[in-house]
Amino acid sequence: MKIKKLILGIAIISVTVMLLSVSGFADSTEDGCIDIMAGKNATVDGSVLTSQTCDGGYDSRLIIIPAADHKPGTMAPVYKGIIRAAPEFPNRDPLVKLGEIPEVAHTYKIFKIAYPIANDQGVIVGETTLGNETECSSNKDTAIMYIEQLQIFGLQRAKTAREFIEIIGELAEKWGYADRGEGLNVSDANEVWVFEVYPVGPLWTPESGKPGAVWAAQRVPDDHVATVPNKSLIWEIDPNDTKNFIVSSNYKDAAIELGLYDPASDEPFIWRFTYSDRRKKAGTDRRTWRVYNILAPSAGPWLWTERSHYPFSIKPDKKVSYKDFIAIFQDEMIGTEYDNTEDQAWYVKARRGEHAGEMVKSSLATPEPSREMQTLLNIYSLDIASGKGCSYYFVSQARDWLPWEIGGVFWFGLDNPKTGVFVPVYVGNNEVPESWTVLDRTKFDRKSAWWAFAAVDDQINRLHGFLNPKLDEVLIPMQEEMYAKQESIEQEALKLYKNDPESAKKFLTDYTYSLMEKTEQVYWGLFENFLFETNNNHLRLYY
């Protein structure tokens, strides 16, 4: 009997572990980026919108690299390790120089971070990792281009989104693409594109005469929105439709050579099912499901069983604004079937107060439980757009009726978009506070703005039910004030610009600078106050 019980117990444990692995725990280890974009006719004011959340431990220092002129014969260095290039970084990849390429005569000012965001011409870029099939893994002995280095070169050299794509595509082909499959959303004030690039296998060498990368870009229709949550988005390609597609010459040949596509099969060549990592888990699709359900519910029902066949883009039910994208970045799927806070494990019997004896939701219930909490309570976390492991995020506007110094703006923040603030950074800006340009993740550092936002987010996630409402009391009015002032600030900048563009840029620089200083100090104050409120000699909950 004891042996039977032991065998039964082992069987139950084995099945439980298996189900948890398949259903949920694995999801929490997926890439967690999400990019959302909108064409100019899909927005309330004609803006072109792009965005990104950067998950994981990446360099979140916002560094402005000024425009520069270069003498003939100047060479530009090519680096590996830019995404974790902060001087003080745990387990950081060393910054390694892989080679040099000829520099151009003039490079534009860019806003550099792990994955560089924008230039002073109004080209704005978001990144999301796609992964790739094993067959097209790169030859790191000969290929030297990583996606973040390509972004730097593209932003320094391009005046339009289309030009950016052509520049980095050519560089990846010539010098070899060494990174994983990557996706970019690339915008200017007129259009937005989805760009995807993959390595061409471990046998590539520059001497082969073949392209060292395979890539494709598709234009998002002007009246559509699209989202890329760490998964390839492009379906079939028409290389003759140059208005809507830009592709490498080997976009299909590389797949045939690598054994990823058989033209004799009579099957259509589907880009997204060919090069991208098809083992991506359900969490990536869940974010797409949420975006389409929010922005285009009437085009549904968006069935979960059909999640791998969602379209490249969709026309939203109503025109969207940058505020809608920010709301999605802060969405925690509350009230949906994927609401992580509604797992029954979070409910406990109250021991005191007006609800004594009743089952109440614990203040520990959080949309983003840690892996330890998932294990302890036998629950699992479903991916959401916001993320406790995020490094930075932005939502951008590009507007063709304003000078690019004013019309290009990205609403930027550090750590988790749900608990953080979105500060407007104009592409004409020339400076940010020093605390936003330094980062030491090896120790707690009050000299770094990132730590203020990360510390508050950590507190919120540990006692979400108790602290999140207190954060909202401060965050929501502060964010709404920034929204309300945007039009008047930009009108004042426009007046200045007509007489002296430099004075307009200084005005916007000073405005953003003051907002960054203010929000950082507010968050340091929140951190200290939350320490007091959750001290175990002070806090008394009802259970």
Model-based region annotation:
Residues 253-409:
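Glycine-rich, aromatic-lined ligand/substrate-binding cores of catalytic
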Residues 137-141, 149-158:
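Second-shell loop/turn segments in exported
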Residues 9-21:
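Bacterial N-terminal signal peptides
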Residues 360-494:
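Substrate-recognition/cap regions that form aromatic- and gly/pro-loop-enriched pockets
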Residues 22-26:
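Sec/Tat signal peptide C-region and signal peptidase I cleavage site
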Residues 28-146, 167-322:
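A contiguous strand-loop segment
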Residues 2-10:
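Bacterial N-terminal signal peptides that target proteins for export
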Residues 474-543:
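Histidine-centered catalytic/metal-binding microenvironments
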